């Protein structure tokens, strides 16, 4: 499995932020786990700044562009703590130091002597708006909340306002603005209803901000909020999601990312003219929207994270002044696997009710005997993106095809599509997977007996459901941190997550019958395919009891189950040593049952 190791030791560099003097800080797994690094963009000599055994979750620059704020947890438990690394110092300071509380980092005030965040210190299911005096470590509660999970999204340049989202659901996260001096909070679109908001980009004078939302629309569009008047105006709309915006520091250029079947496209608007400009473009692939996108403090360099099937995740720069786009970081990709990497082809099929479903196909070659694996993304309010995945790339190199669908319930195809799997409609998305399987068989991409399925989180739930409801289609399945019983999942997930997850799956108070009906544990007697189950013991999202239930059920009936549980992991396998233990076993399992 030495070759597989080369795929997993390719560097992931992402989430870049600008510091002073053309320096950036960013996240990289060069040490084997995601840590904070920095480098000068001209010298390109990376320097490691943190040395923890746990991954870094969030990274922000202080308002002074010298100090760095970040968060990490313990063993994947997601009880994030906020750390400060001051310029010129080598030892970060744990500002919060309360392992019983989760702190969601917001940012700093203009003087960089106060840090803003939300936390559930007062009440574990709820997140209050708070600020801390960095000098004294005194925490002040600005606004108490009793409505579950409130996530900070941005702080105004003058430090007066913080924006935060109220997560009623992953796609129902109304944005609020809170005055950090007075505690006054208001919904930026009070007459609105069910919608998602994100990616705020403040003007330098703090008078307002650009953002994305799908209020009263099928797709995410760009709006502008005026703080003084409390009004919203439309800026840009298209028949695809605008997933990210970023405003240059001189307020001249507004960068937007438009997602078409998961492939990112830049649109740059010159706000002084109200029109788009031409600009160099990166290769065809995925522009990470959740990993940040930032303009340089001086000039017009846009720092972003990019990946494709054949290009591992790295930091790139779009330099408008130089009319150039280029990779900034090195993935250290081994020369002997560089030419093996495959980019996917965007395809589609028609599901049981006539709905068009898109999928990405990574094809090994034209050999009709190649096994094929359907990989289902998590979320479910997420999307399959054309990005580097070490397991996919290795399997393709070993002669496997990978089909990665965006079944109903995925984002990126409109709000109506997004909600076609809610609550009692859950199994319609599983029927989409069965239709894809039959499509692959009918088109000759795979032969009977050579089809498998795998997925993580919701994708793990989907894999379990597919092999239970359509057992005749599958010869192997892999469930990674997936739910086997939606009822017990909601009962045992972290208290602050329950409410916004109930918006997707149904509530314990009103939908227990539905939750039982759509849970694979209750139809597990139909499962015949060999199964591999992988989980982290500290998972706060999908408790390890979800894995234990399905493993115990199948083993009691003599069904082949291989179970891996990692004591120092949470919701996913993040540490290199564990990856190098886990994924060779995944490959061995798939080869044994599909080749």
Predicted ranges, named:
Residues 407-595:
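Active-site-proximal cap/loop segments of hydrolase catalytic domains
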Residues 20-31, 40, 49, 69-76, ...:
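Beta-strand C-termini and the immediately following turn/loop, strongest in propeller blades
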Residues 32-37, 77-83, 124-130, 171-176, ...:
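Structural motif
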Residues 331-449, 456-457, 490-499:
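Cap/lid segment of the alpha/beta-hydrolase catalytic domain
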Residues 294-295, 301-321, 484:
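Structured, non-catalytic alpha/beta "coupling" segments that mediate domain-domain communication
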Residues 15-65:
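N-terminal cofactor/phosphate-binding cores enriched in small/glycine residues
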